[in-house]
């Protein structure tokens, strides 16, 4: 394949429609430079020193009136800006445009003779050396902007990017395929369509979400990966929904036909997994439908050894987009070093394939594209391909969006958009070429709208003519791209018609041979679907001990700043108190300091940490202060970049005001780099439900469905403190409902030292078969509560404890109160004011897995126990009560009374009035501590 391209440089100046005015101003400048604005003085000084410019401009001006030039410029601008509306991008059923701006020569009272008398340089600054006159140049522009690729880039604000695109698009350029390459491209299409036809014939009615109508997607991906290989990009991350997924798996990731057909036959596909280990396919114990599954292929098929990953995906359209971005960033980051990670955008690139109805319809796309240029999230440019079959299930565009194109939503992110006819395979390749060049040059996203159609219904059991009869009359008559391109090659004499049909038949034979290798009797019929033995136990404590001096060295380093760094005095007083646990007998380590010490020791162990959230650098509640700001210069300093003997990076970023995309990004990052301790912190836990799709469809079910492991940690501020229904509850009950098969750890802590040991335990589990998500109902007011803060000796040894008890005399206890988090602290402080040895408070630090054995062992030590109470802040239908009740009921059996104390059932999580909150909270505490 050769690319014939004439390079041209941009002229020093192009005044366009303002030519007449600028010449007048130039004359004024020659007489008196100070008579024109300063910026024009600089420009005119440059022009004055170039003898070739002004005479050419004056020649054009003298031959043509300013009015003529203005009309020419208006025509040119319209072609660039609106030519896409008349482009040949629709293989079938072109839309009827009601309002199209003027785009023809005649519309501007111009003709060939007039235009032939005007310099081509007026049309475009780089045309002067290519075309003889404006007429030739405009014909070129019409062909270019109204051809099989429709270009939209005039909305881009950056002049350099816009100018680059203009030159790249308008410079004569042609992708020239030799005959062998054309044959190879035809064969690619024949395999793509032949695969679909075979499945359609042999598995009638089976859902496969056919690619037919946008078949060119596969050669476009192959072209993209080949270009990436030449650029040295060795990690390709692909995200897509179900449409065309099976074809991409087989023809891009090279999943054997035998494996794919086995899945349709419900036999074991893993028997056909390549023995060379080049294809990685993980599976969970409950599994998922075939068109949700992904895989990883290591191959040199595209020019160099590359790792090509197709992300697993639920049916929730577009939600995989931020996951793919996170996976890509993880592949780009070097985290095995001290300080912050270094990011190399040439290591990996993301390709995200969207649907035309879902792309403008799903808000996750807005959130994800907003990450594109942010320091903590950029991946150096994503390639977005819209598989535009111009319908969503049964909904047509008129009911699906309020814009001309499904891609219009991308304009707000200053990215170029190319619409390309899916039946013009060579045009689709050129669109990829331009997109990849732009990404390489500017490290920004590009959107390609692959405009085609959908051969069948939404799925293969659906009849589209019920709701879309007219379009499908034309689609049924329309040849597939395999035949469109094949006939083109026949007409060009590249192949004969017999060769075309012979190869199409050969594809069917190859598929039949693969099919015949499968034993129909080898059914997968195990209904038990047991979780792996590695998940039999809860998160195990990391009981590494530390000397006092070791932790003091870390603490001192975290409180040492560069010379001349000016910390706000008010903040400095707070930070200086962190010396007290090491300098004073009664010094205590609060929550934030416990976290800093844990992070530092984890970094020393070689585990990188990445923490993001809307205010995570400081902390919503002004407690963390992980990034310090010089009060005079604004410069920043991150102490955790300077830990003694640090072996891994600490990366912290304030996130955009987004939950779903940011959590999806962190999930993807951790899936790709399982050694990374990824933490997402909600501003308030109440806002976490904006990420519910990520929780439901990825984080808590991915291992069961796909065998995909994640150790993402969530910090969700949760406590009832009179701040109303939207600043009180992280919806603990929802996470407990998602908890099963040891798929996560859910905690609500009351001790800073237990928090320290928990973080270390989670870090130790990463990149092991025991890794799993961690959900922390993190504190708010407890961040500074002295009851939560602990002495340093609780940090030097020990490990995470699932329950904590107060000191007690066993034979005096008649009532046990089980509580968690702030509720436990409130009860403890109330009991301290009115001591009662008959009441034993037990902090349930780990809610899932529920600590049955620990509680059972404790209750067995209390010979006079009469009552067990569960006490919570949340309403009865929320919080942990409905989850813990079956466990506690079994433990209590008929030996003790069981009672509940908390808010009554409520539709909203909390009261809106702070004073009423206090009354209700005090009543709960009073009733709970009352000894019947």
Curated annotation (Swiss-Prot):
E.C. designation(s): 1.2.4.2
Subunit structure: Homodimer. Part of the 2-oxoglutarate dehydrogenase (OGDH) complex composed of E1 (2-oxoglutarate dehydrogenase), E2 (dihydrolipoamide succinyltransferase) and E3 (dihydrolipoamide dehydrogenase); the complex contains multiple copies of the three enzymatic components (E1, E2 and E3).
Keyword Oxidoreductase tagged: yes
Biological role stated in the UniProt entry: E1 component of the 2-oxoglutarate dehydrogenase (OGDH) complex which catalyzes the decarboxylation of 2-oxoglutarate, the first step in the conversion of 2-oxoglutarate to succinyl-CoA and CO(2).
Name this polypeptide is given: 2-oxoglutarate dehydrogenase E1 component
Organism: Staphylococcus aureus (strain NCTC 8325 / PS 47)
A molecular-function term among this protein's GO annotations: thiamine pyrophosphate binding
Keywords from the named record: Glycolysis, Oxidoreductase, Thiamine pyrophosphate
Reaction(s) this enzyme catalyzes, per UniProt: N(6)-[(R)-lipoyl]-L-lysyl-[protein] + 2-oxoglutarate + H(+) = N(6)-[(R)-S(8)-succinyldihydrolipoyl]-L-lysyl-[protein] + CO2
Family: Belongs to the alpha-ketoglutarate dehydrogenase family.
Membrane spanning stretches: none
UniProt GO BP: glycolytic process; tricarboxylic acid cycle
One cellular component (GO) term of this entry: cytosol
Swiss-Prot/TrEMBL cofactor(s): thiamine diphosphate
């Amino acid at each position: 394949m050769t690319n014939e391209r004439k390079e041209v440089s941009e002229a020093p100046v192009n005044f366009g429609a303002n030519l007449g005015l600028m010449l007048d101003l130039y004359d004024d400048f020659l007489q008196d430079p100070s008579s024109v604005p300063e910026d024009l003085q600089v420009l005119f000084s440059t022009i004055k020193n170039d003898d070739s410019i002004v005479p050419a401009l004056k020649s054009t001006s003298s031959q043509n009136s300013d009015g003529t030039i203005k009309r020419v410029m208006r025509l040119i601008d319209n072609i660039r800006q609106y030519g896409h509306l008349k482009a040949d991008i629709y293989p079938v059923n072109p839309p009827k445009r009601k309002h199209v701006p003027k785009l023809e020569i005649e519309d501007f009272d111009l003709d060939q003779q007039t235009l032939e008398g005007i310099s081509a340089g007026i049309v475009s600054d780089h045309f002067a050396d290519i075309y003889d006159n404006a007429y030739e140049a405009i014909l070129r522009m019409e062909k270019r902007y109204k051809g099989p690729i429709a270009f939209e880039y005039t909305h881009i604000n950056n002049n350099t990017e816009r100018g680059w695109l203009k030159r790249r698009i308008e410079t004569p350029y042609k992708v020239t395929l030799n005959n062998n390459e054309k044959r190879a491209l035809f064969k690619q299409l024949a395999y793509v369509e032949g695969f679909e036809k075979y499945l359609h014939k042999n598995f009638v009615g089976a859902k496969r979400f056919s690619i037919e109508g946008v078949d060119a997607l596969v050669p476009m991906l192959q072209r993209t990966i080949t270009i990436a290989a030449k650029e040295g990009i060795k990690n390709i991350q692909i995200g897509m929904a179900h449409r065309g997924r099976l074809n991409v798996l087989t023809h891009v990731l090279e999943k054997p036909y035998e494996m794919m057909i086995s899945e349709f036959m419900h036999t074991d596909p893993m028997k056909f997994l390549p023995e060379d280990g080049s294809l990685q396919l993980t599976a969970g114990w409950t599994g998922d439908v075939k068109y949700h599954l992904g895989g990883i292929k290591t191959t040199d098929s595209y020019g160099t050894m590359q790792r090509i990953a197709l992300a697993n995906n639920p049916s929730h359209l577009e939600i995989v987009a931020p996951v793919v971005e996170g996976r890509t960033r993880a592949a780009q980051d070097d985290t095995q070093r001290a300080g912050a990670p270094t990011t190399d955008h040439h290591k990996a690139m993301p390709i995200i394939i969207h649907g035309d109805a879902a792309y403008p319809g799903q808000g996750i796309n807005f959130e994800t594209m907003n990450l594109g240029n942010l320091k903590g999230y950029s991946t150096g440019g994503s390639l977005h391909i819209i598989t535009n079959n111009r319908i969503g299930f049964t909904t047509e565009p008129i009911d699906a969006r309020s814009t001309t194109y499904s891609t219009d939503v991308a304009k707000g992110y200053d990215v170029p958009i190319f619409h390309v006819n899916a039946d013009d395979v060579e045009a689709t390749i050129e669109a990829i070429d331009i997109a990849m060049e732009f990404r390489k040059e500017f490290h920004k996203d590009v959107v390609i709208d692959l405009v085609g159609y959908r051969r069948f219904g939404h799925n293969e059991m659906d009849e589209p003519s019920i709701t879309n009869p007219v379009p499908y009359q034309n689609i049924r008559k329309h040849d597939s791209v395999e035949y469109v391109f094949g006939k083109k090659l026949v007409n060009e004499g590249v192949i004969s018609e017999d060769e075309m049909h012979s190869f199409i038949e050969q594809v069917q034979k190859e598929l039949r041979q693969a099919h015949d290798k499968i034993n129909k009797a080898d059914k997968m019929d195990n209904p038990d679907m047991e979780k792996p033995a590695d998940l039999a136990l809860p998160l195990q404590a990391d009981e590494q001990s530390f000397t006092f001096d070791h932790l003091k060295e870390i603490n001192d380093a975290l409180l040492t700043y560069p010379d001349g760094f000016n910390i706000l005095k008010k903040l400095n007083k707070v930070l200086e108190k962190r010396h007290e646990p090491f300098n004073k007998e009664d010094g205590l380590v609060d929550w934030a300091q416990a976290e800093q010490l844990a992070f530092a020791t984890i970094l020393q162990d070689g585990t990188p940490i990445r923490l993001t959230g809307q205010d995570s650098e400081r902390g919503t509640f002004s407690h963390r202060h992980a990034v310090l700001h010089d009060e005079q210069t604004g410069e920043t300093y991150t102490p955790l970049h300077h830990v003694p003997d640090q072996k891994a990076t600490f990366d912290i970023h304030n996130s955009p005001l987004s939950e779903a995309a940011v959590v999806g990004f962190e999930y993807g990052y951790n899936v790709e780099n399982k050694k990374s301790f990824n933490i997402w912190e909600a501003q308030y836990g109440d806002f976490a439900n904006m990420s519910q799709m990520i929780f439901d469809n990825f984080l808590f079910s991915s291992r069961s469905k796909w065998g995909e492991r994640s150790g993402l940690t969530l910090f969700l501020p949760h406590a009832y403190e009179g701040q109303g229904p939207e600043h009180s509850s992280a919806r603990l009950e929802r996470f407990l409902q998602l908890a099963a098969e040891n798929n996560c750890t859910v905690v609500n802590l009351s001790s800073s030292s237990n928090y320290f040991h928990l973080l270390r335990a989670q870090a130790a589990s990463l990149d092991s078969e025991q890794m799993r998500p961690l959900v922390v109902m993190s504190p708010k007011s407890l961040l500074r509560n002295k009851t939560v803060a602990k002495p340093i000796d609780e940090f030097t040894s020990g490990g995470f404890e699932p329950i904590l008890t107060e000191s007690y005399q066993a034979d005096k206890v008649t009532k046990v109160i089980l509580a968690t988090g702030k509720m436990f602290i409130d009860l403890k402080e109330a009991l301290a004011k009115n001591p009662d040895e008959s009441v034993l408070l037990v902090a349930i630090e780990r809610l899932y897995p529920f600590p049955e054995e620990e509680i059972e062992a404790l209750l067995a030590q209390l010979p006079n126990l009469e009552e067990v109470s569960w006490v919570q802040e949340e309403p009865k239908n929320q919080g942990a009560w409905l989850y813990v009740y079956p466990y506690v009921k079994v433990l209590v059996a008929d030996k003790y009374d069981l009672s509940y104390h908390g808010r009554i059932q409520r539709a909203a999580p909390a009261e809106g009035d702070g004073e009423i909150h206090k009354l209700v909270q005090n009543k709960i505490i009073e009733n709970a501590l009352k000894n019947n």
